[in-house]
Curated annotation (Swiss-Prot):
Top-rank taxon: Bacteria
Taxonomic path: Bacteria, Pseudomonadati, Campylobacterota, Epsilonproteobacteria, Campylobacterales
Motif DEAD box per UniProt: ranges: 130-133
Binding site residues for ATP: 38-45
Family matches, as NCBIfam families: PRK05298.1, uvrb
Coiled coil: none
Biological process terms in GO annotation: nucleotide-excision repair; SOS response
Span of domain Helicase C-terminal: 433-599
Protein name stated in the entry: UvrABC system protein B
Protein encoded by which gene: uvrB
Length: 657
């Protein structure tokens, strides 16, 4: 096994080192569950990386949204540049699952847009897990959803080696069985092409490189990576393992068994519907399943193939579905599961199964799916939490559930290496909250700092924004109706000073890390509920813990239990950090963090390109497409998927001209 090796100019602080040593010892002693309770800004990610290094154990890091997953992926790539850091989230840019609403007799077809880059990264993750031991995968809730059988997937690989003999007919047939398509004109991921004694294969999990095989008769004479765009050799190969284009690809025998099983279940279900006078449901089911069977027999794939996962994986009804966890467990090694922001992530994981089950039961009842589709599901919470792994829950505000599971193995990281204190908390009467906040905001803005305001409703966010605009403040609002790209632009705009105040409903959901913000205003802080719970209040206050002048103002008429507990915890941490700073002569300083690039293409640049493209010769257009493709690959490498998608769309437009 290749060792996990951290590359960093920093070394752990005393508080981090204590947490690292205690958690490492706890896991080595065989404890299944442990919790790291670390305040915002204390360097929990660096602590997590050091625990992995100490344990020398493959790890799966799970979090509750894609933005945080991307941030963690970037950080871990930096910490472990010599190891295999992978990214596994949903590959859908957009996803509308199929559903049926009986009272309206309305069937909603599945509608989705697959992001090719995210699909590549998912395939890269499973390929790495089967090929290497030094793997850390950053994942979202997708890790709990069903995948193909890892043993079947591994059994479909193609082993290539220099000087070995291969029948060309066998090789081409094997590539097709693995899901690769022959395309001698337009070469893309998941394709292969043949030119005499040369076969080029573009692995579905590679970015901008492919594999070239050069034969002398039946003997593999040469093999190397080459750059797809430049068509230049980049690395010689002696051996290479090629993985299929999908985790659901299965061998010929398994496919035949699956088709037979589907046919048998269809017969049983049609008999049930006919016996119960449900002729419409019977006709509907027969038509849909017969079409899927035709596709499976002719191509080995069909739309919605995941609904037949039980047969394709060879499992029994009700059996725990295969998931990303099984790709860790297939080698029999110990591994670590880290649940980041566990106070949000675990409740999200808990609710997945019930919602999925309810929708599919309706589809089965009305003849849109076979009952076996119910086995294409996310893991039940008990199946997830009882996996063979060791678990580490990480949060500034863990729930009672994590603490009860961890028992005596809860470890604290309260001190910040920067010396930053938890923010000062001020209580103000909510009767005049709008006017008081205006006066406080003007002072903060005069010092070139920013303001975050959290309210309870979309309407209030919009109206408060409008009111402050009329008073001359540069202010914007953010809520769930605003898409991901625009949210990113708003956060960027706040940080760069395009405007000074951002108003939102549940700003902590966005995983905001804004060192420029020195004032957090919590409107109607005494209105009990999810948005004003102890956990939410502490998380919201933490947004001001990146700035040396951080302050929180809570507008209220009374002090609720949630407020009281949040204030006491924050003040206790503030006092502890202050005493540590004085003892060690530390001067607090604000966090410094680069502003992320915009996800948008410059509109004027895009329009200019399009206008020129109509008038330019095809050779010039080809050069621009090549340049755009390179930019697209670079954007995808940086996980800037919206930007990559915009570039992809522009490439399509250029090719049509």
């Amino acid at each position: 096994m290749k060792n996990f090796e951290i590359v960093s100019k920093f070394s752990p602080s005393k508080d981090q080192q204590n947490a690292i040593e205690n958690i490492t010892a706890s896991i080595k002693n065989g404890n299944k569950y442990q919790t790291l309770l670390g305040v915002t800004g204390s360097g929990k990610t660096f602590t997590m990386a050091n625990i992995i290094k100490n344990l020398q154990m493959p790890a799966l890091i799970m979090t509750h949204n894609k933005s945080l997953a991307a941030q963690l992926y970037s950080e871990f790539k930096g910490f472990f540049p010599k190891n295999h850091i992978e990214y596994f989230i949903s590959y859908y840019d957009y996803y509308q699952p199929e559903a049926y609403i009986p009272r309206q007799d309305l069937f909603i077809e599945k509608d989705s847009s697959i992001n090719d880059e995210l699909e590549r990264l998912r395939l890269s993750a499973t390929a790495s897990l089967l090929s290497f031991d030094d793997v850390v995968t950053i994942a979202s809730v997708s890790a709990n959803y069903g995948l193909g059988n890892p043993a079947e997937y591994q059994g479909m690989v193609l082993f290539l080696e220099i000087n070995k003999k291969f029948s060309l007919k066998f090789l081409l047939r094997k590539l097709v069985d693995m899901g690769y398509s022959r395309n001698d004109t337009y070469f893309d991921r998941g394709d292969f092409r043949v030119n005499g004694d040369i076969i080029d294969i573009y692995p579905a999990y590679f970015n901008d490189e492919a594999i070239r095989l050069e034969f002398f008769g039946d003997e593999l004479d040469d093999m190397y990576h080459f750059d797809v765009i430049e068509n230049k050799k980049t690395q010689n190969l002696k051996k290479f393992i090629l993985y299929p284009t999908s985790q659901f690809i299965v061998g010929e025998n398994r496919l035949k068994e699956a088709i037979k099983g589907i046919e048998n279940e269809l017969g049983e279900r049609l008999e049930f519907f006919n016996d119960n006078g449900k002729l419409v449901e019977a006709q509907r089911l027969k038509q849909r399943v017969d079409f899927d069977l035709e596709m499976l027999e002719s191509t080995g794939m069909c739309k919605g193939i995941e609904n037949y996962a039980r047969y394709l994986t060879g499992q029994n009804a009700g059996e725990t579905p295969y998931s990303l966890f099984d790709y860790y467990e297939i080698k029999g090694m110990d591994y670590l599961v880290i649940i980041d922001e566990s106070h949000v992530s675990l409740p999200q994981f808990r609710g997945m199964y019930a919602g999925d089950r309810s929708r599919k039961e309706t589809l089965v009842e009305y003849g849109f799916r076979l009952p076996s589709a119910l086995d294409n599901r996310p893991l039940m919470f008990d199946e997830f939490i009882n996996k063979r792994a060791k678990f580490l829950f990480v949060s500034a505000t863990p729930n009672d559930y994590e603490l009860e599971l961890s028992k005596d193995h809860v470890y604290y990281q309260i001190l910040r290496p920067t010396g930053l204190l938890d923010p000062e908390i001020v209580l103000k009467d909510s009767d005049n909250q709008v006017e008081i906040l205006y006066d406080m905001a003007k002072e903060v803005i005069a010092d070139n700092e920013r303001v975050l305001v959290t309210v309870l409703t979309k309407k209030m966010a919009e109206e408060l924004s409008k009111y402050y605009l009329e008073l001359g403040l540069k202010v914007k609002y953010m809520h769930s109706d605003i898409d991901a790209i625009e949210r990113n632009e708003l956060i960027r705009g706040l940080r760069t000073g395009d405007f000074d105040m951002l108003i939102g409903i549940n700003l902590l959901r966005e995983g905001l890390d804004l060192p420029e913000v020195s004032l957090i205003a919590i409107m109607d802080a005494d209105k009990e509920g999810f948005l004003r719970s102890r956990t939410s209040l502490i998380q919201t206050m933490g947004r001001a813990a990146r700035n040396v002048n951080g302050k929180v103002v809570m507008f209220c008429k009374k002090i609720t239990n949630s407020m009281k507990e949040a204030i006491e915890i924050t003040q206790k941490r503030r006092k502890y950090q202050d005493e540590y700073n004085k003892t060690h002569n530390i001067t607090p300083k604000s966090v410094s963090r680069n502003v992320e690039e915009s996800l948008k293409l410059d509109d004027t640049e895009a329009i200019d390109r399009a206008m020129k493209a109509e008038k330019m010769p095809s050779s010039e257009r080809a050069k621009i497409v090549k340049d755009l493709r390179k930019q697209m690959m670079e954007a995808a490498d940086k996980l800037e998927f919206e930007k990559a998608a915009a570039l992809r769309d522009e490439i399509k437009k250029m090719r049509k001209l």
